[in-house]
C-alpha cells in the first residue's frame, strides 16, 4: 500500500498526551505477555508501524487502542493484520499453547507496539513544535530502526531495557549498525526513556529529555 505522510505532521503533542484510550495491555503482566515466544517476536508482513501509520493517515488524528481494534476487523483491512494475527494464534495452539495463552501474548505484542507508536508520534510532534523539521516514514521505522529523522540524523527512541535495547546493549540492532554507521554519511542519536513505575499509560519522555535531544539535533544539523 502506498504511504504518504501528511496527518503525522499535523499532530499536536498535548492532544496525544491527553488521548483517552483503554489500557492496551489489558490486565496482563509480562509473564503472560511474553509466554509465547513466536508471538513475542512476531513481525507481521505489514509492520506494526506501517499498519498504525496507515490508520492514522486515514483518520487524520491519533487514535485510541479500541479504535484501532475496531478498524482492524473491517473487511478491507483484515488481510493487513486481523487474518495473519489469527494465523499466529493457530500456530501457537498447534505448538502446545492454549488459545488463551496465545491470545494473551498477541494482546501484549499489539499493545506494546501501539504504545511505542503513540510515543514516536508524540516525539515527532514535539520536535516539530520546537522548530525541528522532524520526519517520519514507516519503512524507515520498520527497516532501519529510525523512529524519526532530521536532515541526515537518525533518531531512535527506546525504553531502557537490557533485554531489548539500552543504548547499544540488547537484542534489537541499533540504526547505526543497520545503516553502516558514520561511514554512511549519516549521524545517529538516541533518546532513551527510563522505565517508569506506572501501568496502563504510555511512557512518554519528559520535556527536559526531549528539549536536550532537540538541542543536540540542532548542533548536528548545523554541522552539515
Which residue ranges define each predicted feature?
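Nuclease-adjacent, charged terminal/linker segments that flank catalytic cores
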Residues: 1-88
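Polar/charged alpha-helical tracts
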Residues: 14, 66, 87, 91-94, ...
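Surface-exposed polar/charged interaction patches
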Residues: 22, 95-99, 223
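Solvent-exposed, charged helical/coil patches
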Residues: 77-122
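A short acidic/basic microdomain associated with nuclease active sites
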Residues: 120-147
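Short, solvent-exposed polar/charged micro-motifs at secondary-structure junctions
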Residues: 145-149, 200-201
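Active-site beta-strand-loop-beta-strand hairpin of nuclease catalytic cores
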Residues: 149-156
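Catalytic cores of nucleic-acid endonucleases
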Residues: 158-222
